[in-house]
């Protein structure tokens, strides 16, 4: 396996881990969201993160790597705890926690999407980065609309 393939596998594995961590953070956040429209949208975002995990794990295997397990890493525990604490303050706190989670995810997708990769991997990364931007934009828009 070439060095750049190893680096790509590691980068995609880090994205998978971020998506795993985001799924757990959404679990905490949606518990405190009473607004049915926002809750439904957050659950949709969580499902998109699950889809990213499955798809990117398959790409990792196709590249000859082994995807990470579906448990949180240390950063994931911190993100989940932060989401839980913020969510206790209700909808606004939950959205603030998810904004931070999505900012981290967007930042890393933004870096990795520019890497050299096989066409099908590149397309998946572009699609998922686009979805991540939608998640963040939605959360920011709702926060800005709140008093």
Task: Describe the residue ranges of each PLM region.
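Carboxylate-rich helix-loop segments that flank metal/cofactor sites and access channels
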Residues: 54, 58-96, 100-106
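Charged/polar positions within long, soluble alpha-helices
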Residues: 24, 28-31, 54-61, 65, ...
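Conserved alpha-helical segments that form or flank metal/cofactor-binding pockets of metalloenzymes
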Residues: 37-73, 135-147
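Preference for long, well-ordered alpha-helical segments
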Residues: 101-147
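Alpha-helical bundle segments that constitute or directly flank the non-heme di-iron/ferroxidase center
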Residues: 2-33, 92-116
């Amino acid at each position: 396996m070439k060095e750049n393939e190893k680096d790509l596998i590691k980068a995609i594995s880090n994205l998978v881990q971020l998506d795993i961590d985001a799924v757990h953070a959404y679990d905490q956040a949606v518990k405190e969201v009473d607004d049915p429209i926002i809750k439904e949208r957050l659950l949709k975002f969580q499902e998109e993160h699950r889809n990213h995990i499955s798809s990117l794990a398959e790409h990792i295997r196709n590249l000859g790597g082994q995807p990470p397990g579906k448990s949180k890493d240390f950063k994931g525990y911190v993100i989940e705890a932060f989401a839980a604490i913020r969510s206790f303050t209700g909808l606004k706190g939950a959205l603030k926690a998810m904004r931070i989670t999505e900012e981290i995810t967007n930042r890393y997708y933004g870096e990795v999407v520019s890497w050299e990769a096989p066409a099908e991997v590149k397309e998946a990364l572009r699609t998922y980065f686009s979805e991540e931007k939608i998640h963040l934009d939605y959360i920011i828009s709702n926060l800005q609309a709140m008093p």
